[in-house]
């Protein structure tokens, strides 16, 4: 699993590059995206409330995703099969398939990058993540 957005506004680029570096070294069979969400009552949520940590907007998360994906050099299935992967395209549909098999890399890497660009054009400004 990897958690886009965990680095927040201050460390998003380092987080993206280091995530790709580690995943490249491991080259797992499956890589699953679970975007960061700070649950109430957790230390991270408290840090957000105290302005010690700034979460990424949905568009900023997509920019982090783009950097991570661009730097991935793996033979793996990259999956966006969780409800937290809520980004939309210009038609309001989910940006990524929520299939457990995901996208086969490296064959479908460009497809994922194109989808991210589509999401950035759609302007995913507001989080539609639903609390469970």
Question: Which positions does each model-derived feature cover?
Answer:
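Conserved radical SAM core fold
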Residues: 2-7, 38-41
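Long hydrophobic alpha-helices with heptad-repeat/coiled-coil character
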Residues: 3, 11, 25-29
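Auxiliary Fe-S-binding modules of radical SAM enzymes
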Residues: 17, 21-132
């Amino acid at each position: 699993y990897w958690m886009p957005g965990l680095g927040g506004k201050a460390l998003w680029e380092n987080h993206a590059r280091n995530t790709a570096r580690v995943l490249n070294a491991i080259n797992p069979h499956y890589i699953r995206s679970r975007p960061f969400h700070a649950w109430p009552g957790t230390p991270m949520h408290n840090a957000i409330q105290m302005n010690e940590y700034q979460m990424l907007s949905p568009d900023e998360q997509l920019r982090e995703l783009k950097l991570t994906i661009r730097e991935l050099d793996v033979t793996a299935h990259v999956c966006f099969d969780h409800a937290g992967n809520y980004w939309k395209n210009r038609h309001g549909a989910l940006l990524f398939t929520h299939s457990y098999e995901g996208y086969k890399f490296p064959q479908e890497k460009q497809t994922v990058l194109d989808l991210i660009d589509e999401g950035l054009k759609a302007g995913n400004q507001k989080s539609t993540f639903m609390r469970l």
